């Protein structure tokens, strides 16, 4: 696994799951950090400040990295997050841009809630369309 992929995964596991934001940033984030997530300010300080409240609201965090894909200096990480014993479940897709040293310098994400299958499909029905013979 490349250094930039390791650094992207490190932010998830060490910063978000384990709560070791400063340590993860020191080893994985570049000098500048541009954040495109709603409510999260740019910079290492903004990232760290956001997670102070996040950790209070979600003291139990389990992160499962499903897959990591690279394209040049971009790293895409597909993640399942289980918060507070499954009280909140999120599926996220994150895009990280790395600098020439493999350190993370920019981040985008898409987040959706995840519910058990019975909740998703309990009132949903699907019928195959009719096709001409």
Tell me what each language-model feature is.
Residues 1-133:
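C-terminal and inter-domain tail/linker signature
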């Amino acid at each position: 696994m490349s250094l930039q992929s390791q650094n992207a995964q490190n932010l998830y596991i060490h910063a978000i799951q384990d709560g070791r934001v400063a340590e993860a940033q020191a080893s994985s984030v570049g000098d500048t950090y541009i954040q495109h997530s709603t409510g999260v300010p740019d910079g290492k300080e903004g990232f760290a400040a956001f997670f102070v409240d996040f950790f209070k609201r979600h003291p139990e965090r389990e992160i499962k990295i499903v897959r990591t894909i690279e394209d040049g200096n971009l790293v895409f990480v597909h993640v399942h997050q289980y918060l507070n014993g499954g009280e909140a479940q999120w599926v996220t897709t994150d895009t990280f841009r790395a600098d020439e040293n493999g350190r993370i310098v920019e981040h985008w994400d898409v987040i959706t809630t995840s519910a058990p299958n019975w909740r998703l499909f309990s009132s949903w029905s699907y019928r195959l369309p009719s096709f001409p013979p």
